[in-house]
Amino acid sequence: IVSNNDMCRSRMAQEILNSFGRGMKVSTAGILAGNSVLDVVCQVMEQNGYDFSRRKPCDVATYAQQTWDYVITLCPEAEEVQKEMQGVVRKYVSFNFTDPFQGGIHVEDEQEERVRALYDIMHKELYEFFRSELMEKLLPRCSCGANTYCRCE
């Protein structure tokens, strides 16, 4: 998952996708690595029941040479990652989630409100993506080809 600086949207998306099911390896990066995950982001995610990671943000170069089933970009600026990762990605998926800190907000309550609104939008859209693109691939399969519990045995 790629965003501008791996400090807000990408981390939120990682936790949200991981909450939908097992079997996924979800990594995050920014076009440029930011300094640290913002406290308000951690607070909102923890309020929604996530054990939020405060690991240091990293940049796209960390993952550029690896093979990926999906590279998910979360803002138009992050789409430039395709130039760096061509040939090692099976599918690119783009979202356009607004940066809650764009324009420089200094009032703490307003920051939290914007991050909470972003969380709600991301959760809805990422669930739809998971349901339509990933869920079927991650479900256990029986030897008969059924992807849910069957009565073969």
State where each predicted segment sits:
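Conserved active-site segments centered on acidic
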Residues: 1-62
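Short glycine-rich anion-binding loops that position phosphate/pyrophosphate groups of nucleotides
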Residues: 5-7, 76-79
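Short glycine-/acidic-enriched loop or helix-start segments at secondary-structure transitions
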Residues: 11-13, 38, 79-84, 104
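Local beta-strand N-terminus motif with an aromatic residue
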Residues: 68-69
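Phosphate-binding/catalytic loops
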Residues: 81-142
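Cysteine-cluster motifs in flexible loop/terminal segments that predominantly coordinate metals
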Residues: 140-153
